[in-house]
Amino acid sequence: MGLSFFSKHLPIQEGQPWASKTPADIISTVEFNHTGELLATGDKGGRVVIFQREPESKNAPHSQGEYDVYSTFQSHEPEFDYLKSLEIEEKINKIKWLPQQNAAHSLLSTNDKTIKLWKITERDKRPEGYNLKDEEGKLKDLSTVTSLQVPVLKPMDLMVEVSPRRIFANGHTYHINSISVNSDCETYMSADDLRINLWHLAITDRSFNIVDIKPANMEDLTEVITASEFHPHHCNLFVYSSSKGSLRLCDMRAAALCDKHSKLFEEPEDPSNRSFFSEIISSVSDVKFSHSGRYMLTRDYLTVKVWDLNMEARPIETYQVHDYLRSKLCSLYENDCIFDKFECAWNGSDSVIMTGAYNNFFRMFDRNTKRDVTLEASRESSKPRAVLKPRRVCVGGKRRRDDISVDSLDFTKKILHTAWHPAENIIAIAATNNLYIFQDKVNSDMH
């Protein structure tokens, strides 16, 4: 496995409107577009920051992989639901890019209740020489127009414009936890705790309810939906995960309401490991189809698992993310960390998987060699071009000089959100209000 990841740290920068140290600046989602040229982050303040990859220059070959701010905009504002007397916070829960179909880029962003479709366009020319309007766009006095001229386009400084194209509201009673764009490029789905809705990208005033697990009596509720995703190639298939650790694969061709799943993926519980925390730590916090569409990756509190779509009985691979926390579940329950929702990601060839942990650590697992590594995203360890050193957490006994004791882990520093470039070994790591971009120098080790 290539461990030679070096970094570009996109820290808090003075003078940037999105970069003051407040809770609103905590990054809540990270997403590459389909080419990897753009990277979007959303934060708790309802803002979206888009980074663009710099073209490689002959003078500075190391600049490949550098991402700089491309555009910043306010996606959501705080609202108040007067019917339920509830505040709706502006925090961006998820961002999903639409496949690019013309010169413009489009993305979906959502908070707890409202999904918005945004269009991002570039302008580097402006029209001049209108017959009936002056340079400021005001209508001229027709008596002063004595000749006709052909308007021309003049070069201007590049301007990135972000405009809202659609607002999809009133589709969810509960908090939206995931959105996923279908491979048909016309529809997408959104999931909350109890329901999944199917939307058409061009229609905002109605959606189709495709999953509803709400019981007639809420006292009978035993599980909630935690994440959902469309299959990357088959537009009729989607999966959703639950707080009980199960995955349900659904086929929209079978029925309009997919309450009856096509396949149920569930690992039988080992009775010897049963404890008060068993159900909490088995809750799936993220599910991702592999790029090939053959596998699914899930993250629960202590592990990441790879499932084969053709085998429902158990995962084909299980990787321990931080098994040393198993003895600390009691204190993690008391400080609510046990409810943290970690995401997971595939690399472009589905051979390596990545997920976050505590103490600003993140983990990588090579599926072919079965090797794994723990790396750290922090200002100290991530000076530009510095090679990341593998970190090790030790539980009692002898300790090497660079090892960190499990008792000195900082649980306030957690990496929940990660993203992997769709084709190259470039990863984006959100560590509270800092974004780190790491790139593998060898760039072929993980392919």
UniProtKB/Swiss-Prot annotation:
Report if keyword NADP is assigned.
no
Q: Does the keyword Heme apply?
A: no
Q: Where are the WD repeats?
A: 22-61, 87-128, 171-209, 220-260, 279-317, 334-375, 410-446
- Mention any one GO cellular component term assigned to this protein in its UniProt record: protein phosphatase type 2A complex
**What Gene Ontology molecular-function terms does this entry list?**
protein phosphatase regulator activity
Could you tell me the keywords of this UniProt record?
Answer: Repeat, WD repeat
Q: Which InterPro entries match?
A: PP2A_PR55, PP2A_PR55_CS, WD40/YVTN_repeat-like_dom_sf, WD40_repeat_dom_sf, WD40_rpt
Q: Per its database record, what is this protein's job? A: The B regulatory subunit might modulate substrate selectivity and catalytic activity, and might also direct the localization of the catalytic enzyme to a particular subcellular compartment.
Note the subunit structure: PP2A consists of a common heterodimeric core enzyme, composed of a 36 kDa catalytic subunit (subunit C) and a 65 kDa constant regulatory subunit (PR65 or subunit A), that associates with a variety of regulatory subunits. Proteins that associate with the core dimer include three families of regulatory subunits B (the R2/B/PR55/B55, R3/B''/PR72/PR130/PR59 and R5/B'/B56 families), the 48 kDa variable regulatory subunit, viral proteins, and cell signaling molecules. Interacts with IER5.
What is stated as this protein's family in its record? Belongs to the phosphatase 2A regulatory subunit B family.
Q: What is this protein called?
A: Serine/threonine-protein phosphatase 2A 55 kDa regulatory subunit B gamma isoform
Question: Species name for this entry?
Answer: Macaca fascicularis (Crab-eating macaque)
